[in-house]
Amino acid sequence: MTILEELGLLKMDFLGLRTLTVIQSAVQEIERIHGIRLNMEELPENDSMVYDMICQGKTEGVFQLESGGMKQFMRELQPRCLEDMIAGIALYRPGPMDFIPKYIKGKNAGGKVQYTHPKLEPILENTYGCIVYQEQVMQIVRDLAGYSLGRSDLVRRAMSKKKAAVMAKERQNFVYGNEAEGVPGCIANGIDEATANKIYDEMIDFAKYAFNKSHAAAYAVVSYQTAYLKYYYPVEFMAALMTSVIDFPNKVAEYILVCRQMGIKILPPDVNCGMYGFSVDNGAIRYGLSAIKSVGRPVIESLVREREENGQYRSLKDFMERNSPQMNKRAVENFIKAGALDCLDGNRRQKMLVYQKISDSISQDKKNSLAGQMSLFDLVSEEDKKEFEIRMPDVEEFGKEELLGYEKEVLGIYLSGHPLENYRGMMEKTISAKTSDFQQDEETNLPKVMDGQKVIIGGMITDKTIKYTKNNKVMAFLSLIHISEPT
């Protein structure tokens, strides 16, 4: 891993971030709808409204800032500039997190920060007396112990690779100097032994999870850009964000809840309006067609292309004819269950009862055409052909539970409602814990509900497994969803 560096060559790591695609898609959608081409490199750097949103912890979907712990940290940190964001991202990791209380205290102290030695003030002033970046360590060893630029970089490398033996050896040089290697050391520069060792101890603690500022800065810029898009163009941003996770129903469901909290309406998938991914439709977000299970990208792209070239679909038969043969029966059935064909005549139950007959009729017509055969249907006028059309049966729509069940089956979430909606008021008054409260916290690795704690839960059982212990006692494992959880 170090051969390139030892040869003096530049080594670079390129990270493929999904967020960059989200930004690009949002910018394209903004241009399509508003006629504005945003230059993300020229955004106002210190927009107070954007920082207000971040300080309130409303950062779901914002790069690096959407976890529960990070949202709480932003509420405590109250960042008002990019420098604060950079420090926040660098601090919020194992190791540096221990410095968060000290950093926040220093930030709120109004300049009353105490430094281990006066020479540290110009180096640590921007981070309120805390060592946050590798670059600060490099400057400390140069300014306090007289290291050269090259040697300070060796210390940085030792930290980044967590080379404890090298760091321990370097303590001697830092405190006492090394005349043979041209290092004066702290004592020669007027810093007493105890203070020098204390400073080095702090650097050792930091070195366990050393982070370079350039990395944190690059991430902070992307964080700010996504926060800016979320604040000023929430519909376009959330549509792009949900498209980026379209293959993960649980994540889509999470963002749908966020949209509803933001007052953004979610429209069902629609073959006459929808696109491959989530799209903006008159200030609302239209569900992406590719979120429907068992329907591949080529089918969706062909469907949209056919609609754009030859107009909207007029009926179920028209839809199936124009998309045959790439649209198989399973795909049509899932479109019906998802509500993507509600724009065409007939309810979902009617369509479920006739789509196979229509498919068989289309297949037979194609066989006759290939064989050069004519049917009775070909001999009548266009007006009389309507008498031969497969008609919708006279049946009522599925019940609410069935409709929701089909949506869950093909979309992975409940979209048009929730099976527990009628019990919302009672559940909100009665229950004391949600299903998410049993999940581990990302910081403490502990759930909100502890072992032995008595709580009242409420929800719908979606799965049950019965098992027997070695003593032949019955055990049951239940899967439960809460009313606030679409999945």
Language model segments and positions:
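Noncatalytic, beta-rich nucleic-acid-contacting surfaces in large DNA/RNA-processing enzymes
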Residues: M1-S484
